[in-house]
């Protein structure tokens, strides 16, 4: 689903400071999911987290871009961890591809606010350049892990794919659009959609 982005600095922070940063990040995720990126401000996040002052956020994050960078890193890391765990359990490359796709839907089901927040950040980056988010945005959009899986499957003789990077982009594009469509139309049967997409893309791996 995603490549793990660069981690932010953690040296020199106390346990209490780390806990407060985590609280702010989670509150930002929930705020983004509820009211969108255009309305998400330090004031709105304070209300959501019951913080007494926006200064508490400013103490840990220099500005909104820095905070959104940490939010993106947190979401991408969580999604990547879930995907890696699911894929690692499979012995075949077909099984790994199925697990890769299933992990995307599993993440949406387990962490709907995180999925929505990441979509909001992606929309923000599309609307206006945010230099502080460049590297984490690239990480969120990366298909490197999926390309590697498909190429390894080809080398193992399980897949016959003419251009793994193109298929990886098709898979990821479909998965990303599912998130946006689900948010707009609240599709109830995600399990059915997961099965259909899995069937479509596993068939593609058998094409000469």
PLM features: what roles do these ranges have?
Residues 77-85, 110, 119, 128-156, ...:
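Amphipathic alpha-helical packing segments from all-alpha helical-bundle domains
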């Amino acid at each position: 689903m995603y490549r793990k982005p660069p981690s932010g600095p953690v040296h020199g922070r106390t346990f209490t400071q780390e806990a407060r940063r985590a609280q702010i990040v989670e509150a930002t995720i929930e705020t983004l999911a509820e009211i969108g990126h255009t309305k998400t401000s330090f004031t709105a996040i304070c209300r959501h987290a019951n913080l007494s002052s926006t200064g508490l956020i400013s103490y840990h994050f220099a500005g909104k871009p820095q905070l959104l960078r940490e939010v993106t890193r947190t979401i991408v890391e969580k999604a990547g961890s879930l995907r890696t765990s699911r894929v690692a359990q499979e012995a075949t490359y077909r099984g790994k591809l199925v697990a890769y796709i299933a992990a995307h839907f599993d993440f949406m089901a387990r962490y709907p606010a995180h999925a929505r927040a990441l979509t909001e950040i992606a929309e923000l980056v599309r609307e206006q350049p945010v230099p502080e988010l460049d590297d984490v945005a690239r990480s969120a959009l990366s298909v490197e892990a999926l390309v590697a899986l498909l190429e390894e499957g080809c080398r193992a003789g399980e897949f016959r794919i003419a251009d793994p990077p193109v298929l990886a982009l098709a898979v990821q594009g479909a998965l990303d659009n599912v998130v946006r469509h689900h948010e707009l139309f609240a599709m109830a049967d995600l399990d059915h959609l997961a099965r259909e997409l899995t069937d479509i893309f596993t068939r593609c791996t058998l094409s000469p």
